[in-house]
Each structure stands twice: as structure tokens, then as C-alpha cells.
Design a protein with these regions (language model features):
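Short acidic/polar hinge/loop motifs at secondary-structure boundaries
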Residues: 2-25
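C-terminal beta-signal and adjacent terminal beta-strands/loops
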Residues: 379, 478, 487-523, 535-543, ...
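Transmembrane beta-barrel wall of Gram-negative outer-membrane proteins
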Residues: 61-86, 100-137, 152-180, 220-223
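Transmembrane beta-barrel strands of outer-membrane/channel proteins
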Residues: 56-62, 82-88, 129-135, 176-182, ...
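Surface-exposed extracellular loop regions of Gram-negative outer-membrane beta-barrel proteins
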Residues: 137, 184, 238-246, 292, ...
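Outer-membrane beta-barrel signature, preferentially recognizing the C-terminal barrel domain
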Residues: 149-167, 255-261, 322-379, 397-423, ...
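N-terminal periplasmic accessory domains that precede
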Residues: 9-13, 28, 33-55, 67
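Gram-negative outer-membrane beta-barrel transporters
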Residues: 375-377, 396-397, 402-495
Length: 607
């Protein structure tokens, strides 16, 4: 379980393809074995490692490097797999990033590691141990005539899983797992003015999960596959730890106590095949405990598929799901900040109901086409109240007063949401030319009595249009050309209409310039207009690549020439407001991380 499934807020996949054996994306028709979330599920299986001989792959490029190694620990009985990657766009692309970001100095990099070991205990027993560690780093520096400003964002996941696989009999298998997961976010802000006055803010937040699960698969006959099991997780939330310094006059060190919650679930599901029909009925019962409050929620699931002909199939599904962890997202301009908080006695868990239907058809020459539609309702979603933030809790900046670890509840409000749309996907899998074209038309709206005068508005991640085109052309056995184009409607954000200084939330003077962190931490009193009434510019880009492979006696060498963002689109990562030297006029600025970036890489796969 990971809390941030992407690098750089969705620009890169969190998962290294070199370490994966299979990936399954579940967008609808959720099986009962999945719980705890309202949205799509990505089910990953890592490579087990070669238990016969040592093998691997090493890639070195201008913007990133990667490596994967696998081999036997005890030949024929146990094996290992380890992989890692690291980008260094921040170093090589710095001049391009500064030009695209209107002079601001911004940079980003990430690194991650995957490892797995497995051991065959007996003919019926296997033991697996796997782990993941990943970290993202983003920085933004800006100098004006009067001030110097620096901010650093860091966030990361790490997981560790031990799994025992046991064959009870030829028709029944069991998996018992112990799971640890950690997520943390840190933000550092430092500002100096011409008089050497300093403002410094350090913020950290983290979650630790300790869980166990047991899954049992039973196939009584070829038509049925019954799955059942249970899981329980202890979530330990550390909502925030803050160090605040304003000059030499004020020093605040706040650390909230840990919030312990317990989430459990038991499920049963069946895969039933009958001629042209496939049925997938199931139910999950979820249970959640926080302090002295308990929630017990049934979650019925049902999906089906019907093969009209060999080349045409239709499907439909219904799922009710509950989520006991809330994601609080910033809504205005500035750095995108997402904070995880638990359901409590006063903040109820989210619940959704989703209906989906679709049709798929296979054509000649390897073409396939699918069309799907969905409708989802959501209850008890939360957002910040107007002008609120995680730090503006009662007495938060008074060192003499203790702060309750649930004081943030006063800064949020609960409401409803709706999400609906349709997707079309055309794919070609055979021949010299392969690839796909995908398009999604969707709407996501929210409504809160205490926000936007109770009027519905579009959610931050409402994306009206989302399109992707991927083409792979095999010129020969040695040469392959590729092209990717993506497009997405910009995020909906709230644009400030005006600003007031000296709110009294800080005990001394405020920072002299407005900066991206002010939106995140609300260091100014902001006059907001309608919620999420402004759209960031659309995100789109084209990437091209050319690969040349050459087989050697002990492996394959690959040279790749690629260009990221071919037409040099300045896609916005975030906006911020900048005061002029006189401090009287604000200008909206844009930070772009990745303009056009050419790259050359070399990969060697040995076997």
C-alpha cells in the first residue's frame, strides 16, 4: 500500500518497469478483495528473480540512470531481484527550466529502489520478501531586489512485505502476509530580506501502517473460483510537526501526538463462468476504530461480462466502497500540497457508489476497440473551509497553549461529490505498427454547504478532456521508432481576488514578499473568488524516440535517442504571485519544470 502512487504529482510512474512482472489497472467492477479506497486500483506483481543464473540490465542516460540485477541465492531454490533508478534533470536541464519558469530557479529529481527475495521451502510452500523505497525532491528559489526566498519539498514512500504462499491441496491455495508502509511529507521555507530579517518554516507529516492479511483461493470446479480472506491495519498518523522562526524574536516548535486508528476487512467473492456469461458477485465488510468511535460498513460488489460473439463483449458493474483516510488538497495557486488525515468521530469516512458499463470489439489485423461509461456518487468528502488551512488551528501560534491532534477538524467541512464520464480506447497489438489512442471525457463536481455559498463547483482534479496517442513502429529487427502525445485539461484552482496583510496569526511581522508557500500555509489574508473558478493552462506534450538494438554473445546493447517535449510546451507546474520592488503590484508567474529536453541513453542487458 502506498499513499502517493506517482512521482512528481503524476508526471512519472512510481513503479519501475524493470522490477515488475505484471500490472493490472482496475477502474471499475472492483473485486471484493480490494478495499479502503474509492478510486482505481493498481495491482502490481514484482519479478521473482532468476533462480538458475545471474542476469541484469544497466542503463545510463543524460537525464536518468537505472539498473536491475537478478540471480540465484541457492541455485534452483531461492533467488533475488534488485533494481534502482535516479533522475538528474535538476542538474542538466537547469538553464532550460529557468528560462521556462520566467527566471525562477526550480528543480526536481527522484530516486527509487525495489528488491525482492524468494525461497522455496517445500513443494507446497514458498516465502517472499519484497521492499520499496522512493523519494521525490523539489526545490524553488527566487531572488528579488529586496528578498531571497528558498523552498524545498520532499516526499516519499517505503514499504516492506513478507508473504507465505501455501498449497493446501490441488484446489486450494493460501497467502499470509505481514505489511509495513510509511509515507512522509516535508516542507522547508526560508526567506531573508534586505535587512537580514529571516522567516523560516519547517513542516513534516507522516503515516506509518502495520498490517496483516490472509487470502484463500478455492477452485471447486473449472466454472468457479472462490476467494475469501481478511486484513487488518494499524494506521499511525502524525498530522504535523512545525518549527517556525521569525527573526530573533519568535521561535515556535509544535509537534502533534500520534493518532492511532485500526482498519479491518473481511471479504468473499466468486468468479463464475457459464457459457457466454461471466459473473463476479462479492461482498466486503469493513470495520474502523478511532478513539472510542467505530464504523461498520457493508460493501456489496457485482460485475458481469457477456460474450455476444467471439469478437464482441459487453460488461457492467456496481460497487459500494468506503475510505477511512481523507486527502486534503490545496485549492489555490502555489505549490500543490496534499495532506492525509484520518476519519474521526467528527469527520466521517467517505463512501462512494459507482456504476459502469462498457462494450469491446476485436477487429482484423490486431485492432481492438472499447467504449466505457461510468457514474459515481461520493458522500462525506472533505475540503478546507473558505480561507482555512491546516495551520490555522485555534491557538496554534500561542506556545503557551497545547494543540489537540484533531484541532484540524475545525478547518474542514464535509460535503458530496459526483464523477461521471466516458472513455474510448483503440489499440493495435500486431504488425510493424502498434500502439493505441485513448480519450476520456469526464466531469467531477463537489458541493459543500459551507463553501462557495453551497453552489456546486468543479473539483481540483476535474479533467474535462484527457487524451493519449502512442505509436511504435518497428523499422527492422534492429531499429524501432516511437512517438507519444498526451493532453489533459488543466486543474481547476481558486484565484485570489485580493490580499490583506497583518492578519494577527503570526506574533510578529509577516514575510515581506508573497511566495508559493503563503498559499499553502495561509500567511496572508486572501480574498478568494468563487471556488475553483480558474483553470490552469492545459497540459500537453509530444515525445519521440529512436532505438537501435544489437545482439551480442552475452546480451543485447541498445542505444536510444529521444526528445522529451518536442515542441517545447511550457506546461505549468504551479502559479505564484510576485510583488514588484515597491510592494504595490502583484504579477502572476508560472513555474515550468520540463521544457524540451533531448537525451541519449545506452542500455546493456546481459544474460
Amino acid at each position: 500500500i502506498v499513499y502517493n502512487a506517482n512521482h512528481l504529482f503524476g508526471f512519472f510512474s512510481l513503479f519501475n518497469g524493470d522490477a515488475l512482472r505484471s500490472v493490472e489497472l482496475v477502474k471499475g467492477g472492483f473485486p471484493s478483495r480490494y478495499g479502503g479506497r474509492l478510486s482505481s486500483v493498481i495491482d502490481l506483481n514484482m519479478k521473482e528473480g532468476n533462480n538458475k543464473k545471474f542476469a541484469g540490465e544497466v542503463g545510463i542516460g543524460l537525464i536518468s540512470s537505472r539498473a536491475v540485477f537478478e540471480g540465484p541465492i541457492v541455485k534452483g531454490k531461492s533467488s533475488f531481484m534488485i533494481s534502482g533508478r535516479r533522475t538528474y534533470l535538476d542538474a542538466l536541464a537547469q538553464p532550460l527550466i529557468m528560462a521556462a519558469s520566467q527566471g525562477a530557479n526550480a528543480g526536481y529529481f527522484f530516486y527509487d529502489f525495489n528488491a525482492k527475495a524468494n525461497y522455496i521451502l517445500s513443494e507446497k510452500d514458498k516465502l517472499y520478501v519484497s521492499g520499496y523505497f522512493g523519494r521525490d525532491k523539489f526545490y524553488f528559489n527566487q531572488n528579488t531586489a529586496n528578498t531571497k526566498f528558498k523552498t524545498n519539498f520532499g516526499w516519499g514512500n517505503r514499504t516492506l512485505t513478507a508473504r507465505w504462499n501455501h498449497q493446501i491441496n490441488p484446489k486450494m491455495f493460501a497467502n499470509a502476509s505481514a505489511i509495513y508502509s510509511h509515507y512522509d511529507l516535508s516542507i522547508n521555507v526560508l526567506q531573508k530580506d534586505a535587512n537580514s530579517d529571516e522567516f523560516e518554516l519547517k513542516y513534516t507529516s507522516n503515516i506509518n501502517d502495520y498490517g496483516v492479511k490472509y487470502d484463500l483461493d478455492y477452485r471447486p470446479n473449472p466454472k468457479h473460483m472462490v476467494r475469501t480472506g481478511f486484513s487488518t491495519i494499524n494506521h499511525q498518523f502524525s498530522p504535523s510537526a512545525i518549527v517556525l522562526k521569525v527573526g530573533t524574536n519568535f521561535n515556535l516548535d509544535r509537534k502533534m501526538s500520534v493518532i492511532n486508528t485500526y482498519e479491518s476487512g473481511v471479504y468473499i467473492e466468486d468468479q463464475w463462468r457459464e457459457r457466454k456469461w461471466n459473473f463476479y458477485p462479492g461482498v466486503r465488510i469493513s470495520h474502523y476504530v478511532v478513539d472510542k468511535t467505530q464504523y461498520l460498513k457493508p460493501e456489496p460488489r457485482m460485475s458481469f461480462a457477456y460474450n455476444v460473439r467471439k469478437d464482441i463483449a459487453i460488461k457492467g458493474s456496481y460497487a459500494l466502497m468506503n475510505q477511512y483516510i481523507h486527502l486534503l488538497s490545496s485549492t489555490g495557486i502555489g505549490l500543490p500540497t496534499d495532506l492525509w488525515v484520518p476519519a474521526t468521530t467528527n469527520v466521517k469516512p467517505m463512501q462512494s457508489q459507482q456504476w459502469a458499463t462498457g462494450i469491446a470489439k476485436d477487429f482484423k489485423k490486431g485492432f481492438s476497440l472499447s467504449l466505457e461509461g461510468y457514474y459515481k456518487t461520493m458522500n462525506h468528502v472533505i475540503t478546507y473551509k473558505e480561507g482555512a488551512s491546516f495551520l490555522l488551528q485555534d491557538n496554534f501560534f500561542d506556545p503557551s497553549v497545547s494543540v489537540n491532534n484533531k484541532a484540524w477538524e475545525s478547518q474542514v467541512t464535509s460535503g458530496r461529490g459526483w464523477s461521471y464520464g466516458s472513455e474510448v480506447f483503440l489499440q493495435k497489438q500486431v504488425g510493424k505498427l502498434s500502439g493505441w489512442v485513448g480519450y476520456t471525457l469526464s466531469w467531477t463536481q463537489l458541493q459543500f454547504d459551507a463553501v462557495n455559498n453551497g453552489i456546486k463547483y468543479y473539483a481540483k482534479y476535474d479533467r474535462r478532456h484527457d487524451a493519449s496517442v502512442v505509436c511504435i513502429y518497428r523499422l527492422s529487427k534492429l531499429f524501432t521508432a516511437s512517438m507519444t502525445w498526451v493532453y489533459g485539461t488543466g486543474n481547476a484552482i481558486t484565484m485570489p481576488q485580493g490580499y490583506l496583510r497583518g492578519t494577527g496569526h503570526y506574533p510578529t511581522t509577516m514575510p515581506e514578499i508573497w511566495d508559493p508557500s503563503n498559499q499553502a500555509f495561509n500567511n496572508e489574508m486572501i480574498d478568494y473568488g468563487k471556488r475553483n473558478s480558474f483553470r490552469m493552462a492545459a497540459y500537453h506534450r509530444m515525445d519521440i524516440g529512436l532505438q537501435f538494438k544489437k545482439e551480442k554473445a552475452h546480451g543485447i546493447k541498445t542505444w536510444e535517442l529521444s526528445v522529451y517535449n518536442v515542441y517545447n510546451r511550457f506546461n505549468p507546474f504551479f502559479y505564484y504571485g510576485q510583488l514588484n520592488d515597491a510592494g504595490t503590484i502583484r504579477t502572476l508567474k508560472q513555474v515550468t519544470l520540463f521544457p524540451i529536453i533531448p537525451s541519449l541513453s545506452w542500455t546493456y542487458k546481459f544474460r
